[in-house]
A protein has these predicted regions:
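Conserved, charged catalytic cores of large soluble enzymes
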Residues: 1-42, 46-48, 63, 71, ...
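Function-dense linear segments that define catalytic or interfacial modules
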Residues: 24-117, 129-133, 210-211, 215-239, ...
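Catalytic alpha/beta core of large soluble enzyme barrels
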Residues: 58-60, 99-104, 187-188, 196-356
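Short cysteine-rich clusters marking metal-coordination/redox-active sites
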Residues: 379-382, 395-398
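Cys/His-rich microdomains that often coordinate metals
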Residues: 385-386, 402
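Short Cys/His-rich "knuckle" micro-motifs
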Residues: 388-392, 405
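Short Cys/His-rich micro-motifs in 6-15 aa windows
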Residues: 398-405
Length: 405
């Protein structure tokens, strides 16, 4: 059909919402953005309403604006099961100064973009490795303790980031659009219009072998590829492996069993206390995913890129309730994905030459909801399998990646 054939149609808000929910249930698209929530925390309202975000949904910007991102690897801030909050504060301060300097040295070919960037001096400091941090501290992702840890970690970063921006403003001056911002009436000096953002970190988290963004670990052990001969290579999360070795439980056969199940929830050899800590994405009921995102959002200037995972047999109504809960909890956006809802998926937790094994969900609200068979998708560069994280396909062998919008 040509554009001339398009006809106008009247639709109610409820009908549109229902259509969005059904489409998201069908294949994960579209993601949803709550612009009212976005503009409640618009740091520069004098520039007008914010109407759009970047493809991954974590960065809302005015027309022509940009934001330089950086991420702190939280897995490097745990010693003997305790989080080093003072060191986290110091690294945050240094990261803010670095990103502020990046604004000064970055050049853009479009004058409008350069003007917007220099006018607002936005930076987007975020995190990765939160799932690993929880493993290291012995805290389950889908627990009240996990939510509390999220609040504490992000609050420490948020407070240190804003304090540092105020210090830089005293040294070098406020950002040029300061008079149009929410900071002017408060008489608070500020070098940057906004400071914190949680990006997907799909590629860089692979480079540093940590969990991505605020996501739970997707799989503790999974099939990676064939090595010389008929041997199969399995990747195992190093924190999980170390915990098993400390208890004298580690073996290649056990890792193979974990990979086949996709989770430790129903692996008899794993102690119950470890099962509560080492949960993976599909062990976690959707409401816990939403609650975790909301906990971080309360301490983030911009927004958060995160996927709310659903088991294959989740209903349309369950997806609808996730959207409603997200709105009620103050999220700025939400992306959902029902396992097995696309014809081609890009993550496998087991040897693709063998029959798929269903792994049941052990969370209260998701009993008996299994993971669907996941098909392998090849990397176009090296022909190895791709992994799916936060809407991005990633190759662990050559580094190739792409994101679905």
């Amino acid at each position: 059909d040509s554009i001339q054939d398009i006809q106008e149609e009247t639709i109610t808000a409820k009908e549109l919402f229902t259509e969005i929910v059904e489409c998201a249930w069908h294949n994960g698209e579209p993601g949803i953005v709550f612009l009212d929530a976005v503009n409640k925390t618009n740091p520069v309202p004098g520039l007008g309403r914010i109407e759009a975000c970047n493809p991954c949904g974590e960065q809302f910007l005015h027309d022509g604006d940009v934001c330089n991102l950086g991420s702190i690897n939280l897995s490097k801030f745990v010693t003997n099961g305790k989080v080093e909050f003072e060191r986290l504060k110091e690294v945050t301060r240094r990261a803010v100064r670095m990103l502020d300097n990046v604004v000064d040295i970055t050049e853009y070919p479009v004058d409008r973009v350069t003007k917007a960037m220099q006018g607002n001096r936005r930076v987007g400091l975020g995190i990765m490795g939160f799932g690993d941090l929880l493993y290291q501290t012995g805290i389950g992702y889908n627990t009240e303790e996990g939510i509390a840890m999220a609040e504490k970690v992000m609050d420490v970063i948020q407070q240190a980031a804003h304090q540092t921006s105020q210090e830089i403003a005293e040294e070098k001056g406020n950002f040029p659009n300061y008079d149009l911002s929410v900071y002017k009436p408060q008489k608070v000096p500020m070098r940057n219009a906004a400071l914190t953002t949680v990006a997907p970190t799909g590629t860089i988290s692979m480079m540093y072998d940590c969990s991505s963004g605020i996501e739970p670990v997707f799989a503790l052990s999974y099939y990676k590829g064939q090595i010389i001969g008929s041997n199969t290579l399995y990747y195992t999360n190093p924190i999980f492996e170390n915990a098993l070795r400390e208890r004298g439980l580690f073996s290649e056969e056990l890792m193979k069993k974990v990979a086949e199940h996709g989770s430790v929830a129903h692996v008899d050899e794993i102690p119950e206390d470890m099962k509560k800590t080492f949960v993976v994405a599909h062990d976690i009921a959707p409401i816990w995913h939403v609650r975790m995102q909301a906990a971080f959002q309360r301490h983030v200037d911009n927004s958060i890129s995160k996927t709310i995972n659903f088991p294959h047999d989740a209903s349309v109504e369950e997806v609808k309730q996730a959207y409603i809960s997200a709105y009620q909890m103050g999220l700025k956006g939400l992306t959902v994905y029902r396992d097995g809802s696309r014809q081609v998926e890009v993550l496998t937790v087991q040897d693709p030459t063998k029959k798929s094994v269903t792994a049941e969900n052990n969370s209260t609200n998701a009993q008996n909801k299994g993971m669907a068979t996941q098909q392998v998708h090849e990397c176009p560069n090296c022909k190895k399998e791709l992994r799916m994280q936060e809407g991005c396909a990633l190759c662990a062998d050559c580094g190739y990646s792409y994101c679905s919008l």
